[in-house]
Regions:
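Flexible, solvent-exposed loop/hinge segments that line or gate ligand/substrate-binding clefts
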Residues: 1-76, 84-106
Length: 106
């Protein structure tokens, strides 16, 4: 698939990583972040890369367990991603995810 820089790329960890390391920042109110068709300077980026999101309630009777699982998913759980062709999330996304997870309460 042709990316914004005009190069043809294929789906894979290298192209996804190139898209994920682009300089795009998450929306501070929603944490939404798009890495689809990143700027030209990311010439190795696969143009239709995206993040996988989890929608969870901010208030839950199971908040402690939910937070524990989500923290694991965005930290140690990232080690399982490459075997499933998922690129680990970049540090900038991890910081936002941890702040958001911390808001979950009973």
């Amino acid at each position: 698939m042709k990316n914004r820089s005009g190069k043809f790329t294929t789906p894979g960890l290298r192209g996804i990583l190139a898209a994920a390391t682009s300089d795009q920042k998450p929306d501070p109110t929603t944490n939404q972040l798009s890495i689809v068709n990143p700027p030209k300077k990311y010439d190795l980026a696969y143009p239709i890369s995206t993040y996988t999101y989890v929608i969870v309630p901010v208030q839950s009777a199971k908040a402690p367990d939910l937070k524990k699982f989500l923290f694991w998913a965005v930290t140690k759980g990232q080690a399982f991603g490459p075997k499933l062709l998922f690129q680990p999330i970049p540090k900038s996304v991890l910081v936002v995810a941890e702040k958001t997870i911390a808001k979950i309460h009973s």
